[in-house]
Design a protein with these regions (language model features):
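Beta-strand-enriched cores of mature, soluble protein domains
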Residues: 20-159
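Sec/Tat signal peptide C-region and signal peptidase I cleavage site
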Residues: 15-19
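Sec-dependent N-terminal signal peptides
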Residues: 4-13
Length: 159
């Protein structure tokens, strides 16, 4: 009998952390890691471009914070033209409750800008600002793939 109770506690306890309602505003700190596949055009040493799709997951710091255990998928495009690097990425994230966020990332002049586009459930009408720090680089495990992580911090305000 004790084994069954212990097993139930193990299964049920992660959900108790998410039963509490999120504060209407606060700060966030999380790390996201991903893996993806890309299609590359190598026109020359100074002119390249690629499109990609990636999937990944996020962990908040400390665990249990906003955006903890979110999963995401992204599509995007990168270009390096005469040394000028640009990138554009759109990501759909889903949290443990099934609520979603749509986020747009753009890269130019060595800086990543993140824009919250839309949300469902608790994220509907959310406003967020923050910074994105790329971690890595990481070696590709297989040709045509890429892996990476970033660290995101900032503030949010829910509707």
């Amino acid at each position: 009998m004790h084994r069954y109770v212990f097993a139930l506690l193990i299964v049920a306890s992660p959900f108790s952390a998410f039963a509490a309602e999120l504060p209407k505003e606060g700060s966030y700190d999380y790390t996201s890691c991903w893996s993806g596949v890309n299609n590359v055009i190598t026109f020359s040493k100074t002119h390249t471009a690629s499109s990609f799709e990636m999937t990944g997951a996020s962990r908040s710091n400390p665990p249990g914070g906003i955006f903890d255990k979110n999963t995401f998928r992204c599509v995007g495009m990168n270009a390096s033209l005469d040394g000028k690097i640009t990138a554009s990425t759109v990501c759909e994230s889903t949290d443990v409750d099934g609520d979603k966020r749509l986020t747009y990332f753009s890269t130019g002049d060595g800086k990543v800008t993140r824009t919250f586009v839309a949300g469902t459930g608790k994220y509907e009408g959310m406003v967020a600002t923050g910074t994105v720090e790329m971690l890595g680089p990481f070696p590709a495990i297989k040709d045509g793939t890429f892996q990476g992580c970033n660290h995101q911090t900032g503030t949010y305000k829910l509707k």
